[in-house]
UniProtKB/Swiss-Prot annotation:
Residues 75-85 have a biased composition (Basic and acidic residues). Signal peptide: none annotated. This is Avian agnoprotein 1a. Keywords: Coiled coil, Host nucleus, Host-virus interaction, Phosphoprotein, Virion. Changing residue 97 to A: Complete loss of VP1, VP2 and VP3 expression.
Length: 176
């Protein structure tokens, strides 16, 4: 008996790689067979693990990436950019709303400042601040000691003094 002749192209490859097979053993896997020697064989009548129709694993993501990816990318990009554009529009509208609220709040703050200012000027004109009492403070020099010094009694009136009005804000100040 003679042994079958081996293909000269594959002669010696078994010694180089433990995973190589002779050409006559290369064939498509049959039903129920594994696709490679590294995956376990499935039971007869069922799909191998990780196949496209496996209900537990869902569709194989590599299939979509390699086979259909070139057709889906432009749509995905448009969809992604459309979502980004809608988020930008929404953010701009929120920003504009916040700007309007800020303007209203600034107007309210200005109104409150005017109210406080008006209340402060009305009480300042009727009452004397504690830093400036009604009676003149005695100085170190008395009018008798230095007759050349002017007296404050001659310039004082019944209302607030001129010097007091100069330091306080006047009521005729224009409103903002």
């Amino acid at each position: 008996m003679s042994t079958p002749a081996r293909d000269p192209n594959t002669a010696g490859t078994a010694a180089l790689s433990p995973f190589s097979t002779p050409n006559h053993e290369l064939r498509a896997p049959g039903p129920g067979e594994a696709h490679s020697p590294f995956t376990p064989t499935a039971a007869p009548g069922s799909q191998p693990a990780g196949s496209l129709s496996d209900p537990e694993d869902g569709p194989d993501p590599t299939f979509n990436f390699y086979i259909q990816g070139h057709r889906r990318r432009p749509y995905d990009r448009q969809n992604r950019f459309g979502k980004l554009e809608s988020e930008i529009r929404e953010t701009k509208s929120q920003l504009e709303t916040l700007r309007q609220e800020l303007k209203h709040l600034q107007a309210d703050v200005d109104d409150l400042k005017e109210t406080v200012y008006a209340a402060g000027t009305s009480t300042a004109s009727t009452s004397v601040p504690p830093s400036q009492p009604n009676s003149p403070t005695p100085t170190a020099t008395t009018p008798e000691a230095s007759p050349a010094a002017p007296t404050t009694e001659s310039t004082e009136t019944t209302g607030p003094s001129v010097a007091t009005n100069a330091t306080e804000p006047s009521e005729s100040r224009p409103a903002r």
